[in-house]
Amino acid sequence: VYVDRGVKIGNGVKIENHATVYAGVQIEDKAFVGPHVTFTNDLHPRSFSTDWKIVETLVKEGASIGAGSVVMCGVTVGEYAMVGAGSIVTKDVPPRALVYGNPARVRGFVCKCGRKLKKEKENQKFVLMACLHCSEKYPISKESYTKYRKSKGEQ
């Protein structure tokens, strides 16, 4: 594991073997960083550049980042979100979103226990999602849910 100077790591965080966490990354409490995960910190990397700036990245509480993923600088991975193995994260990940792929896209939503959520009902602002495993329920913003449906080709 390589953790650069200035990285902020919360309580109960698990960072697996061969992860690389560069300056500018903040990982909040109870997050998980899988093996071979890499965080970047420079939008315009050049070996000869003298004016580069660290671009901050935030991994929120309870989020999980799967093995071999790359998290580009400047993004926020939301609370209890889950990034699938081998993903390339180029944009913010909403809270409780399940994302994977290259680039990573929202493919669903997950419970705090890690299982996929099912849509229960919706109103103008939120979609209520429920976990069939532990019976927890979560309001997901209509904006996040709409992006998910569009990524599936739905209207």
What are these regions (language model features)?
Residues 111, 131-134:
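Short cysteine-rich clusters marking metal-coordination/redox-active sites
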Residues 130-131, 138-140:
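Alpha-helical "lid/cap" subdomains adjacent to substrate-binding clefts that gate access
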Residues 145-155:
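Short, intrinsically disordered terminal segments enriched in charged and Pro/Gly residues
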Residues 119-120, 139-143:
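Short, non-ligating residues that shape and space the ligands of small metal-coordination modules
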